[in-house]
Every structure is written in structure tokens, then in C-alpha cells.
Amino acid sequence: MKIPSKFKLFGTTINVVWDNKRLNDQSVYGLYEYSTSEITLSTSQGVKELSKDRIIDTFYHERTHAILDMMNERGLSEDEKFVDVFSKLLRQAIESEEY
């Protein structure tokens, strides 16, 4: 799966950017910011490169935050266990599609 540079939710463009330094300074792999409609991702944790699988999981995790925030479901968006499980199920559903 390729990670998009942007996608839309309710007509709002969500940009996907890469910033290893910023996220390493915050000790996170990814971040969704509602105020800027932006997902920031990292490809490393310190000097260690993240696996492609970890990066894709992180993208789906942050995308789930974006979806829930756009739905005004802040409580669910703040529930990291829910977001983590839901994002993994969403990834599996999309990646296992057959046509």
C-alpha cells in the first residue's frame, strides 16, 4: 500500500507530510492535527528506521483520529486503545479486498 500525500474528509483536504525530526523530538511515530488538517509521519525512531509495516499502521492510526475528529467524536478519538484496534481492522479490510 502506498501512503497518499492527501485525501478528503467531508470536503476537507487532509495533507500527509513527513517530519522525522519533529516527531522524534515528541517521541511519536505519527500525529494528526485537526487545526491544520494534517497528518505528520516519521520513517525513523531516533537512529533506527521504522519498518514499512509500522509506518503503514501509523498512517491508518492517524487517519482514524482524523475520521473520528471530523465526526466530532473526540471521546473516541482520545481512546487510544479504540483507535489502535479500529485502525488495524480498517487496514486489514482495505488491504484484503478482492475484486
Predicted regions located by residue number:
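Catalytic zinc-binding patch centered on the HExxH motif and its immediate surroundings
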Residues: K2-K8, V17-T40, E49
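Post-HExxH zinc-binding segment in Zn-dependent metallohydrolases
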Residues: E73-Y99
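Short, function-defining helix-loop hinge/capping sites that tune catalysis or transport
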Residues: D19, D69-E73
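Active-site recognition of the HExxH zinc-binding catalytic motif
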Residues: D57-D69
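Short, surface-exposed, polar/charged, turn-prone segments marking secondary-structure boundaries
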Residues: S35-T36, S42-G46, I67-M70, F86, ...
